């Protein structure tokens, strides 16, 4: 018996089997959940291929979070096929090249707008898809990178993560009376496809392991997946609006 027996989860942005979302989907299935994946654009074919590597191959739905039509179609599919949803994982993030790198001032508003819409506002989009299908409550979990500090080269993605954190708190406040919990998991740096596209990502890795009290393995997504699965379970019923650090303790220490 698993801690997610009978639960139905929407998992976004599984690109490869190195994705954090893949690790969450796999562990969720192992703990008894039924999952459906979403992908978008050129990444949709990657999601479909990667879905075959899960213990049970799930359905893959197209969801560009900037498209209200696709969001409505996903909601309609979930309602028709499942009738209810118990949880959703937000693992979505994107920034144009100008929003990353050494020059924070290089990005114009059009680039920043895309970054904020895809990486932060999309949490509200996912909540709008699943909340009506959670009559008995549920759990929305987002993947985050701690935005309290300014990181090398992270630039406007860091700003978007700060917006994501604020959005999660307001969603927690608004959806709490309906029994829906909203939390984020602030992960340490993990070598995913998305992470490798960030200029200066190696600087995060190099600093993390030696400073984290519990150490940190950037090749191991399991601690992050376990935290997400715990938040999807019924074991944390009073936890919402939380930013759960899964980073080996790096966030808690100084120099």
Region spans (language model):
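Catalytic loop of short-chain dehydrogenase/reductase
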Residues: 13-23, 93-132, 136-177, 189-192, ...
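A short hydrophobic alpha-helix cap/turn motif
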Residues: 29, 83, 134-135, 173-178, ...
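The beta1-alpha1 cofactor-binding region of Rossmann-like NAD(H)/NADP(H)-dependent oxidoreductases
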Residues: 45, 63-74, 222
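A glycine/serine/threonine-rich, flexible loop-to-helix segment
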Residues: 49, 177, 189-213, 253-255
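C-terminal helical subdomain
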Residues: 121, 184, 203-239, 244-248
């Amino acid at each position: 018996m698993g801690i997610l027996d009978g639960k139905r989860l929407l998992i976004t942005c599984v690109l490869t089997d190195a994705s954090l979302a893949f690790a969450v989907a796999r562990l969720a299935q192992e703990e008894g959940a039924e999952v459906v994946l979403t992908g978008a654009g050129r990444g949709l074919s990657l999601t479909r291929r990667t879905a075959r590597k899960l213990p049970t191959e799930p359905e893959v739905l197209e969801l560009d979070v900037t498209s209200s039509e696709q969001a409505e179609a996903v909601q309609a599919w979930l309602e028709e096929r499942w009738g209810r949803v118990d949880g959703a994982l937000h693992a979505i993030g994107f920034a144009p090249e100008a929003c990353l790198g050494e020059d924070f001032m290089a990005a114009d508003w059009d680039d920043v707008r895309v970054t904020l819409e895809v990486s932060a506002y999309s949490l509200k989009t996912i909540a709008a898809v699943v909340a009506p299908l959670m009559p008995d409550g549920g759990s929305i979990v987002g993947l985050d990178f701690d935005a309290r500090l300014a990181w090398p080269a992270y630039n406007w993605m860091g700003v978007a993560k700060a917006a994501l954190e604020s959005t999660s708190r307001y969603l927690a406040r608004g959806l709490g009376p309906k029994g829906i919990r909203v939390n984020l998991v602030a992960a340490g740096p993990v070598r995913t496809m998305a992470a490798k596209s960030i200029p200066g990502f190696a600087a995060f890795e190099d600093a993390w392991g030696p400073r984290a009290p519990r150490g940190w393995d950037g090749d191991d997504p399991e601690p992050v997946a376990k935290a997400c699965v715990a938040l999807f379970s019924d074991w944390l019923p009073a936890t919402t609006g939380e930013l759960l650090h899964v980073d080996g303790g790096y966030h808690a220490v100084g120099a």
